[in-house]
Each structure stands twice: as structure tokens, then as C-alpha cells.
Amino acid sequence: MKLTDKIRRVYLPMTETGFYILFCLQKEGHGYSITQKVKDMTDSQVLIGPGTMDGTLSKMEKDGLISFVREEEKRKIYRITDLGHKILDIELKRIERLYRNSREEG
């Protein structure tokens, strides 16, 4: 899939949930493993509920940001796609710019 205007409008800037899901899926994973990793990475400050996780994974898969790899013990394993990497890279650059600007002004 291509980085269309629609994809840009929907995903940029990213929600915190969307960002962490794409970030975690740089390595294959399932919803629960992502939830636990995000909880650990953020010292429990970001908690993604199962409904939010399932809905976001489903939408991202439909939009081509992630792809289903296989099923293990009734859990769907996903990974980020090239389009997902593009979105994540754009968002990381935006966050870096925000940080840089805050340092220059502060």
C-alpha cells in the first residue's frame, strides 16, 4: 500500500496507542504482548485495554500498516509493514522536532 493523503489524515500525527503499537511491532507480536511491553516501557503510565488494542490492530491491518503473520495458541501474530515503517518514521521525526524545539525555547 501507498502513503496516501487518507492514510496521512488518519494516522498523522499519531495517537499514543497507535505509536506504541507500530513501535512494538518492529518485532512480531500479538495484542497481549504489545500491551505488556507498553506497560513496561512506560512504567504503567500508558495502559492499552483489550478493546482498544483489538480495534486498533484491526484498523491498522485493514489500512496496510501491519500484517497478520500467523496464529499461535489462538493469538494473532502481527508485524509492521513498509507503509507502517513510513508512518512510524514520519512520527518519530515529528517527535524529535518537538523535543528539539522545546530545548531551543527552554
Q: At which residue positions do the language-model features occur?
A:
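Intrinsically disordered, low-complexity serine/threonine- and proline-rich regulatory segments
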Residues: 1-13, 96-98
